[in-house]
From Swiss-Prot:
It comes from Homo sapiens (Human). Belongs to the LovG family. PANTHER family: ESTERASE OVCA2. This is Esterase OVCA2. Pfam families: FSH1. It is an enzyme of class 3 (hydrolase). Disulfide bonds: none annotated. The gene is OVCA2.
Length: 227
């Protein structure tokens, strides 16, 4: 009997996460899904500076390898490289470049069976699927999506109306009861856009859980798509 092919999943990092840091943060999940899913991590295209130190000092990007630079998918102010998920933004600066980057990754690194997004990456993953469902040829619909600490992106212009339509693909939504960065009601609102959404809550905060209870839920969800 032929071995089961691992599912391939493109994973979109959160705001202020480096590619290497996101790989490390998903290490427990990668171990939990070993042999069942291959996780390919992608961080945003835009470098995010560290907050100023006590004397206004910032870290030196020039001494930091690209894969270790904190990055983001878009900023919510025109002049400052900052992002707030919970406030109506003045702009979504850099979003189009990020959509282009995801499209390139899907084309260059794919095919993928599913998408996984964490925090800002979850909001972007949902938007990518909404655009694909609306007919954007850059974004073929995946077979499934996993959204961890997700939220509905605000202030994205005409794209916001696209996200208000039901998204017809299997989805698993994971969020913590004590998440102070993305409150659970934000993730619940995003899940409501997916008919038949499965929700998985945990007692922790803003991270990707991979303990035994979550591992079983992930495997049960992913086994629907095994070949």
């Amino acid at each position: 009997m032929a071995a089961q092919r691992p599912l391939r999943v493109l994973c979109l990092a959160g705001f202020r996460q480096s590619e290497r840091g996101f790989r490390e943060k998903t290490g427990a999940l990668r171990k939990a899904l070993r042999g069942r899913a291959e996780l390919v991590c992608l961080s945003g295209p835009h470098p995010v500076p560290d907050p100023p130190g006590p004397e206004g000092a910032r870290s030196d990007f020039g001494s930091c390898p690209p894969e270790e630079q904190p990055r983001g998918w878009w900023f919510s102010e025109q002049e400052a490289d900052v992002f707030s998920a919970l406030e109506e933004p003045a702009v979504c600066r850099g979003l189009e470049e990020s959509l282009g980057m995801v499209a390139q990754a899907l084309n260059r690194l794919g095919p993928f069976d599913g998408l996984l997004g964490f925090s800002q990456g979850a909001a972007l993953a949902a938007l990518v699927c909404a655009l694909g469902q609306a007919g954007d040829p850059r974004f073929p619909l995946p077979r499934f999506i996993l959204l961890v600490s997700g939220f509905c992106p605000r202030g994205i212009g005409f794209k916001e109306s696209i996200l208000q339509r039901p998204l017809s693909l299997p989805s698993l939504h994971v969020f913590g009861d004590t998440d102070k960065v993305i409150p659970s009601q934000e993730s619940v609102q995003l899940a409501s856009q997916f008919p038949g959404a499965i929700t998985l809550t945990h007692s922790g905060g803003h991270f990707i859980p991979a303990a035994a209870p979550q591992r079983q839920a992930y495997l049960k969800f992913l086994d629907q798509f095994a070949e």
